[in-house]
Amino acid sequence: MFKKSNKEPQLDAFASVPMMLESSALKQYSDQGHWHNQFHDQVVMRIDETIFSILFNNTTGAPNSPIRTLVGMMILKESFVWSDSQLFEHCRFNLLVRSALGLFNMNDPLPVESTYYLLRKRIYDHQKQTGEDLMGKAFAQITSEQIKEFDVNGRSIRMDSKLIGSNIALFSRYEIIHQTLCMFFKTLDNVEKSTLSLADLEQLEKLATEEPLKTIYRSTREEVRSRLQPIGIISYKLLTLFGNLQNESFLLLRRVFNEQYKVSEDQQIELRLKEEISSSSVQSPHDPDSAYRNKGDQKVKGFSVNITETCSEEGLNLITNVLVEKANIPDTAFVEPAIQATIEVTGQIVEKAYADGAYQSPANDKCCENIDMVFTGIQGAESRYDLEMTPKGLQVTDIKTGECIQAVLVRKQENSKEDRWRIGTPNGYYYFGQQAIRTSTMRREMKGRSLEELHKRNNVEASIFQLGFPLRNNKSKYRGQIKQKMWACCRCLWINFVRILNFTKQLCQRTFKTTFLLVMAPFCSGYLEHRI
């Protein structure tokens, strides 16, 4: 049964840390503006433990340690880029870290490793089974309280995305198929293996002992391709024979088989052409969630992380939403959920949003109907013709010659409801559709905006940099979309905390300066009058 932890733990008269420190150390330890005290107040104490209550019932029992302490440990781990052993070392012996987590007495027990890992596992399993993102809910709840306390203006936002590689090796097609088959074969028990023919069993046992990387190294492309055919046949036999299993390894084998092979009408197994394989296909059997994307000169097998933050010229700006999807998901898919999540977190209507050209799409026009979308660029080369709808119809301006032409409305294309226009050119007719008109309108709007307004989006790149700062070669140390989202939420909570810490320091400095001037003003004026 879930129980809330005590928000006000008692200090031990003999084990309290402040009782053991000398004056200078005590001054820093007790400084409410220092990071450890601010982290405890702004992050740890804001964690609503009831969000995680669904993980505990009469069967699983109550949590052994406070949930807010465990979640705080997760955030600190990703913030300081610690390993698990470093995390527990700091939590045991670093007084500032212990204070940040609410462990104010020397004898306050730290959650043991098994308790920490069990909570992470339960969060992961719960999201995998139900789709409910508990860490995402905790992030939204903490950020919402911070926004209310510091009166953050959420009517103007900006967003950007980053591709992050999963913690997987770059597997070839042969390695993906081979390892997926072997992973399933190793899950079979002796009774299930006894249903296989002797020839099939020998083939599978031989494949299980093979090192696919060495096979690729010493084989030609044709030899590797020829080896894929019998692997496809034996995979199909296993899928047919053990169709009632439906476990994780079976579902993965079936997915890889359908992505890499096809069954002809005469029940022949055929290897798919490279062009037929989707970018969302399995990139590694060790991380089926990851996907492939080639963006400019960056090739990634992993995920795309989208960050949305407030964009106010005055006051504090915080990250309001973080989304993690497969790498091949376009940025346009982030717009609507990011805006809706920001509205829920801030409790304010979004009036203006800054983004680059990758976010613009006709599919988002409806959800952004009352929002001023400021795009800093448009994908694709600029057209030679500027298009503008007038009461008389479509007016086309040749940018190269300056000539204005009235376009003619033509018959719609088959199975299409969109109007089309055309103009005559020396090379024949030139046609324009709704997409071309929309793009031209957006380019005209973008050119009409000031450079200062267009540059406001650039600051979100600093948030993207801070998010990915601990990554090596833009690769995460985690696998799977759920774990990547947990990592991203922890990083964004830390980024928000650092902003709050810096903001409160500046606020204190300004308050001190203002108070000093108010106090000294009468004395200064009297001194000046006396001198005159």
List where the protein language model places each region:
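N-terminal intrinsically disordered, low-complexity, charged/polar
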Residues: 1-32
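Basic, short loop/linker segments at the boundary and entry of helix-turn-helix/winged-helix-like folds
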Residues: 32-72
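Short amphipathic helix-turn modules centered on a small-residue break
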Residues: 51-57, 99-106
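Short, solvent-exposed segments of well-ordered alpha helices
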Residues: 60-64, 78, 484
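Alpha-helical support elements that line or immediately flank enzyme active sites
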Residues: 71-81
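Anion-binding and metal-coordination hotspots
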Residues: 86, 91, 105, 109, ...
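General structural concept
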Residues: 95-97
